[in-house]
Amino acid sequence: MTSPTAAGPTAPAVSAADGRSPLAELVDERSIIVCCGSGGVGKTTTAAVVALEGARRGRNTVVVTIDPAKRLADALGLQGLTDTPSRIEGDWPGQLWALMLDTKSTFDALVAKHAATPEQGRRILANGFYRNISGALSGTQEYMAMEKLYELHDESDFDLVVVDTPPTRHALDFLDAPRRLSRFLEHRLFRMLVAPSRGLVKAVNVAAQTFLRTVSKVVGGDVVDDAIAFFQAFEGMEEGFRQRAARVNELLAAPETAFVLVASPRRDTVEEAHYFADRLHEAGITVQGLIVNRVHPTFGGSSPPGGSSPPGGSHPAGDSSPGGPSGPVTAAVAAGTARRAETLAGTDIGGLYRNLADFQAVTSREQAHLAGLAEAVAPAPVAWVPFLRSDVHDIAGMDEVARHVFAPTPTD
């Protein structure tokens, strides 16, 4: 992946000297928070919770989802979302808005913005090739998400923009989209196709003409003609797109932008989170927070060095110990419970010990996975969110998650 960091320095991890949780500091101090992670880990809900916290802390906040499952509207208690920000009413000092990315509408607006004349814009928007690619071309959604992010940040009154990204491996395209667009606009073939004054036949060599004739036989001459007309109508606009992509790239790397990784205790999602953290590190981007959802509570654990860890809540930077009221459950603790269950086999209390042993075995494995992940993103702060009684589908459910994510850090 190409690094977007050349434009500016990476912000350091925040501290919690005043009793705020480190993640609450991100909400207070950053302009953009990007929630990343694999599918099925509660990332969409987490993005909504972060945005809600922004409103509760007095910020004018908008949350953007490009999640095709459209779960964000459910989490916010809305019937649906559109490409226009919708206000979510609530009794909080700030404002909360939400929208669903509409790739084609965003692309249309960008064309209209950079067209030299209204006529040029109309020709492109009416072009059959453009209508086909504007919502379906690979990478278009990712770039338009970045364009919407830039628009909301630079051309609106929002203090905080929270972005819910696609599942992990697609999110890498999301990060690299501005640079890929720039490379495309600089490609020699593109530059030849946008030069109507020289004519296509004069601009391309014999091999290219042969290729176009072959393509015409497969997809139809009208499709190729539309494509050529589109590129020629695009002439003069590429510099505006290129400059916009560069500014988006700078924004991703700016200190005001924070990347928060979302995961769950399952091995596959932890591996995905490791993968994404590694790719971010390669790009020179620091993970500013880790939120782990659906953490199993622990019973009968042993206290870790330096004290116990809560079953849910925010840990300061460097404290990566998932655990329960008595700290993390080690494999030795789980084995000890299993031996006691065998000793008491056939009794009611023995059955209870067997259930506890099975539970501890699960939590022991999960905690081993999570400890490695927390170490991989250190010194980023970590928040553990326990299993909840029901899925989050309204503001009340989001409040319950927020109590764990943004739990205040005790001060000395």
Map each language-model feature to its residues.
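C-terminal lobe/tail of nucleotide-utilizing enzymes
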Residues: 1-27, 209, 213-232, 242-412
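The Walker A (P-loop) glycine that initiates the GxxxxGKT/S ATP-binding motif of P-loop NTPases
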Residues: 37
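Nucleotide-state-sensitive switch-loop elements of NTP-binding domains
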Residues: 2-33, 41, 46, 50-242, ...
